[in-house]
From Swiss-Prot:
InterPro entries per record: Leu-rich_rpt (IPR001611), LRR_dom_sf (IPR032675), RLP_Defense_Trigger (IPR051502)
Keyword Repeat: yes
Assigned protein family: Belongs to the RLP family.
Natural source organism: Arabidopsis thaliana (Mouse-ear cress)
Keywords: Leucine-rich repeat, Receptor, Repeat
Protein name, per record: Putative receptor-like protein 16
LRR repeat feature ranges: 1-19, 20-43, 45-70, 72-91, 92-115, 116-140, 142-164, 166-188, 190-211, 213-234, 235-258
The gene coding this protein: RLP16
Record carries keyword Repeat: yes
Pfam families cross-referenced by the UniProt entry: LRR_1, LRR_8
UniProt superkingdom: Eukaryota
Amino acid sequence: MNLTTNGFQRNLPSSLGNMEMIEFLDISHNSFHGKLPRSFLKGCDSLIVLKLSHKKLSEEVFPEASNFFSILELSMDNNLFTGKIGRGLQSLRSLIMLDISNNNLSGVIPSWFDQLQDLHSLQISNNLLEGEVPISLFNMSSLQLLALSANSLSGDLPQAISGYGALKVLLLRDNNLSGVIPDTLLGKNIIVLDLRNNRLSGNIPEFINTQYIRILLLRGNNLTGSIPRRLCAVRSIHLLDLANNKLNGSIPSCLRNASLGLGRGGYIRRLFIIITFFLWEHLSVHFSNLCSCKMGLLSIMS
């Protein structure tokens, strides 16, 4: 059921919980407000995709367990949710994509996210979260996109034991992260790395295992030393931003005449295009056979 971009107002009706057979529900971009009805969280046990984005929903996010045992995609971004990230999300063991960004969530990032073993995309940017980033997030075998930008996260980036798992996109800009950038962070899978506007120090790590990185954004830190010459060997890079650091030495000759798409408007536009393309190509959940009685033949593009 697609009810997006209408003029619906008031609270979400409790009767939503009576739709036991529904698999797809998108009521984004309306003016619903208030909290999620308990009857809704306890019903709709056939839901596979639920989109509640861009509304005025408030109070806690999933403070208790729900019956959404089959859900693969949950989008609750751009609302007014407050409080801690609810433990009710812990029961969504089939979840592949979770977006709770652009809310007013506070507290720390729960360590139990690593129990969602099928999770490919976790987006919690633009909230009020604090504390350290749990090392368990970086070792998840399936997690490919992790977006924690624009919070108040602090501490060092962990020296992840397994080389940051399957991560391809890591967005940590506008936090209070400190310490050095671990060599293991630039693993063989990373495509986009955004660490802008933190308090990171030390040298830019070597790019020994990096093969596919397209975007490297390190602006606004306290990085020192020279620009690694090994950057010249990273042929895949599209965007490179090292401004507002404390770097010294000479610019490698391979970068002096490089065109990195930093013209007017090109920076943000290209970053958006590449990340959006990544989401569609690697993470999107697509329905096929929409006209058949079984709506929900799902395939994950990889």
